[in-house]
Amino acid sequence: MLHSTKLVFRATPQALCFPVRSYSRYVRTVPKTASAKTTSKLAPSITTEDEVAEQDPSLQEPQSATSTASFAFHDAPPETRSVLNSSTNNNIDWSDSYHGLGSQPFSREIADILLAPIKDQDIEIKPDGLLYLPEIKYRRILNKAFGPGGWGLVPRTESLITKSQISREYGLICHGRLISIARGEQDYFGGEEKVTTALEGCKSNALMRCCKDLGIASELWDPGFIRKWKAKYCEEVFVEHVVNKKKKKLWKLKSNKKIEYPYKQL
């Protein structure tokens, strides 16, 4: 009787200890949804900058101006605005400012240079009949009127690049005043290696458009002057493409005896 009691006594601790050991190894799993709810209640919500931008469209960075092309310049004008008043530190952000625009006219001496008639021999004509003044002529007139260093062309936006064209907005500054704003554009062909040259053409186009507000070479926008100048100095001739043999009409100066390749005069 005593022996059986011992057996029962020995078995009882084993039976009692076994569930305890197995319970210590058991880890209760918490559902993922419940865990997320508990975490959100205990810890403050942390929102990343990307999530904030998604929630508020106004905080999103503007889409790159080169969204239709596979490359970009990333040449947006730097932020030069200061917390202080611009009149205190003489710091003007020309990418955003209209300082001096239309404030007062230039002197009579400068106006006479800007409004002087252009020479007939300085005008050129494109094959499609468009008259133009070479860019260097505009720069010489500006240098004569304001002096070298007295004027400048500043970019006001990032370059907009597409698969076949580049454009950018520029502002013409003369004697510390904004004079004119224009967007230049230039077509290009041949891939990315042609974009840099096209950007210079875009700048030249913007300079020409800004100079129009100063009255430089204003005759080139006068239909009467255009008709008279064409009749006196130009002629329209039939030409043939040397490769595909297509025929068309092109304009040229009477002083130019030859048609440029790939055309030949009929």
Curated annotation (Swiss-Prot):
It is found in: Mitochondrion matrix, Mitochondrion nucleoid. Residues 37-47, 57-68 have a biased composition (Polar residues). Residues 1-23 form a transit peptide. InterPro entries: Mgm101. GO terms for molecular function: double-stranded DNA binding; single-stranded DNA binding. Transmembrane segments: none annotated. Signal peptide: none annotated. Belongs to the MGM101 family. Forms homooligomers in vitro. This is Mitochondrial genome maintenance protein MGM101. It comes from Candida parapsilosis (strain CDC 317 / ATCC MYA-4646). The gene is MGM101.
